[in-house]
């Protein structure tokens, strides 16, 4: 199969299925304190995971589009992860593989694109700005680069507000699987302008 380097690519037909620096800034929060031992202990346990995978449902909603897909996310921190999107029939629509030496994306036609920046590639291929680097943390229920967030009564992440360039991302957590150790999200939503991305995690496997 031909391999192409991402430069300036047209919007893929299946693309819609995808999913001020200051060193003294401190996390802004309401509710339970992020300095509480409970939150610090939970965050430490999540960060100690050496591998995780989850599968579930993905939805993208905007003023002009409303689409859905099944997703599979496999992550081996700090630099390896795989995102697979499939249609209701189980066929692959898009696959992203990120490794220390680069990123490869394969579309539903089997065409491959390689590059260094997963977020940039997704934006070029789909026209959508998806905060993949932080989403790897958000999907686990930790704030990533965000310094503004709130905790619920169980000392679990409830909301995040994150500014990336000229975009503001608002993340909200609807539910967690508290039978897992550590507890992990089962439903979350990202909102940026007219974009709304919903993720529902049906199951988790962690190490």
UniProtKB/Swiss-Prot annotation:
Question: What GO terms fall under cellular component here?
Answer: cell outer membrane
Q: Which Gene3D superfamilies match?
A: Lipoprotein localisation LolA/LolB/LppX (2.50.20.10)
InterPro entries attached to this UniProt entry: LolA/LolB/LppX, OM_lipoprot_LolB
Membrane in keyword set: yes
Known CDD domains for this protein?
A: LolB
Residues annotated for lipidation of the kind N-palmitoyl cysteine are 22
Say which domain of life the source belongs to. Bacteria
Q: How does it sit in the membrane?
A: Lipid-anchor
For this protein, the record's SUPFAM superfamilies field holds: Prokaryotic lipoproteins and lipoprotein localization factors
Query: Can you state the subunit structure given in the record?
Result: Monomer.
> What does the UniProt record say this protein does?
Plays a critical role in the incorporation of lipoproteins in the outer membrane after they are released by the LolA protein.
Which family does the UniProt entry place this protein in? Belongs to the LolB family.
Protein name as catalogued: Outer-membrane lipoprotein LolB
- Origin species: Pectobacterium atrosepticum (strain SCRI 1043 / ATCC BAA-672)
């Amino acid at each position: 199969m031909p391999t192409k380097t991402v430069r300036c690519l047209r919007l893929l037909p299946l693309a819609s299925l995808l999913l001020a620096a200051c060193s003294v800034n401190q996390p802004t929060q309401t509710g339970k304190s992020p300095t509480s031992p409970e939150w610090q202990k939970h965050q430490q346990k999540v960060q100690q995971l050496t591998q995780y995978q989850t599968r579930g449902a993905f939805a993208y909603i905007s003023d002009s589009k409303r689409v859905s897909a099944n997703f599979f996310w496999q992550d081996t921190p700090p630099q390896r992860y795989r995102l697979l999107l499939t249609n209701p029939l189980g066929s692959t629509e898009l696959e992203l593989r990120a490794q220390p030496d680069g990123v490869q994306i394969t579309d539903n036609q089997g065409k491959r694109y390689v590059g260094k920046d997963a977020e940039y590639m997704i934006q070029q291929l789909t026209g959508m700005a998806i905060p993949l680097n932080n989403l790897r943390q958000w999907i686990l229920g930790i704030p990533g680069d965000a310094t503004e967030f709130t905790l619920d009564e169980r000392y679990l992440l409830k909301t995040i507000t994150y500014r990336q360039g000229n975009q503001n991302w608002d993340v909200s957590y609807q539910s967690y699987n508290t039978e897992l150790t550590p507890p992990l999200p089962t439903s979350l939503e990202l909102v940026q302008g007219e974009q709304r991305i919903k993720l529902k995690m049906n199951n988790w496997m962690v190490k």
